[in-house]
């Protein structure tokens, strides 16, 4: 079945284009977003007033998430879903940046920032299947040519640290946890929308500082810790979401009315929530398929056992924790000593 994996990835990408964007457009989602932007046309960021088109475009990006992350949303199910959504998705930038650091020059996998920005523009449901397609194609070509995976560069702590700062902090601020007000929340959402750039800039700064000080962690540093950490975050959020209930509360008409009217925001929130739910399912279907491919290709777990474990893990631990566990197993395997031919020594399963 491994040879069918690229075709499945392409099918998932097409399903995302139809199921995510097609449904949203059919239900009038863009009209709802225009209504929110019309009520709050500026991000309030100094300097952007001189570029009204750019300011309005950025506000359009903010308006997409604002109805479901507002401090007092009229659709509480949206806020709860977004909390666990962002917590589970945190493992994906760790994978993108780790594999980007490991990839050969010229490999499409190497451009982790580009993949991240593409995810924010086209949704992760479109990006992840395409990423999986190229990952499988290039890893298959490397295996055919007898090549080996490059080791991770020194200072492996840069990836988890940059993801924590560039992804985690903007994601937290987008929910306005300190009740700083709508204007600052809009900037937090905008920072999260551009999180791939935040991660990239943070990583570059950390590497420069580390290089100047001449400090680096030893090669024996266990890089699986990153996956364990984001896996625990994803599992806790998944269990919390299940514990708080999967159904939303009745609509209340006294929230985020400063952005738009209750009716408009209520309908917009429901459309965005449906959009995100479809996006969530396809995103992790693609990433867990990639995890299955890697576990099976390297013969770490039997094909049927890997599929069953990943499916059960999604249900009980959450997709983020399951994906993190699978990638941690792969990372642990890759860190084992290599033989004369470059093959990693392991006992057959």
Curated annotation (Swiss-Prot):
GO terms for cellular component: membrane. This is Terpene cyclase rstn5. The gene is rstn5. It comes from the Eukaryota. It comes from Aspergillus nomiae NRRL (strain ATCC 15546 / NRRL 13137 / CBS 260.88 / M93). Its main location: membrane. The chain crosses the membrane at residues 4-24, 81-101, 116-136, 158-178, 181-201, 228-248, 271-291, 309-329. Cyclase; part of the gene cluster that mediates the biosynthesis of the tetrahydropyranyl antifungal agent restricticin that acts as an inhibitor of CYP51 and blocks the ergosterol biosynthesis. The highly reducing polyketide synthase rstn3, the short chain dehydrogenase rstn4, the cyclase rstn5, the FAD-dependent monooxygenase rstn6 and the enoylreductase rstn7 are required to generate the first stable intermediate desmethylrestrictinol. It is found in: Membrane. Glycans are attached at residue 222. It is an enzyme of class 5 (isomerase). Belongs to the membrane-bound ascI terpene cyclase family. The lineage of its organism: Eukaryota, Fungi, Dikarya, Ascomycota, Pezizomycotina. Its EC number is 5.4.99.-. GO terms for molecular function: isomerase activity. Pathway: Antifungal biosynthesis. It is a multi-pass membrane protein. Keywords: Glycoprotein, Isomerase, Membrane, Transmembrane, Transmembrane helix.
């Amino acid at each position: 079945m491994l040879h069918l994996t690229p075709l499945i990835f392409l099918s998932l990408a097409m399903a995302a284009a139809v199921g995510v964007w097609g449904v949203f457009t059919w239900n009038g989602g863009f009209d709802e977003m225009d209504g929110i932007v019309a009520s709050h046309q500026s991000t309030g960021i100094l300097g952007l007033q001189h570029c009204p088109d750019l300011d309005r475009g950025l506000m359009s990006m903010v308006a997409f998430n604002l109805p479901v992350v507002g401090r007092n949303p009229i659709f509480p199910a949206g806020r709860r879903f977004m909390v666990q959504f962002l917590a589970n998705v945190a493992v994906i930038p760790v994978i993108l940046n780790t594999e980007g650091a490991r990839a050969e020059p010229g490999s499409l996998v190497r451009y982790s920032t580009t993949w991240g920005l593409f995810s924010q523009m086209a949704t992760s449901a479109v990006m992840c299947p395409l990423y999986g397609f190229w990952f499988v194609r290039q890893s298959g070509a490397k295996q055919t040519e007898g090549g080996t995976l490059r080791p991770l560069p020194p200072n492996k702590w840069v990836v988890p640290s940059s993801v924590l700062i560039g992804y985690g902090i903007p994601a937290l601020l987008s929910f306005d946890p300190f009740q700083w007000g709508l204007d600052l929340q809009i900037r937090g959402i905008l920072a999260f929308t551009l999180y791939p750039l935040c991660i990239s800039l943070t990583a570059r700064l950390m590497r420069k500082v580390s290089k100047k000080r001449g400090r680096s962690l030893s090669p024996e540093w266990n890089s699986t810790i990153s996956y364990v950490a984001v896996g625990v975050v994803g599992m806790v959020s998944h269990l919390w979401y299940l514990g708080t209930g999967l159904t939303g509360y009745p609509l209340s008409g006294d929230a985020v009315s400063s952005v738009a009217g209750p009716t408009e925001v209520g309908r917009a929130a429901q459309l965005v929530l449906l959009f995100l739910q479809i996006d969530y399912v396809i995103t992790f279907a693609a990433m867990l398929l990639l995890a299955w491919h890697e576990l099976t290709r390297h013969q770490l777990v039997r094909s049927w056992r890997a599929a069953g474990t990943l499916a059960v893990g999604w249900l009980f631990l959450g997709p983020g924790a399951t994906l993190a566990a699978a990638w941690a197993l792969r990372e642990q395997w890759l860190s084992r000593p290599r033989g004369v031919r470059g093959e990693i020594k392991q006992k057959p399963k």
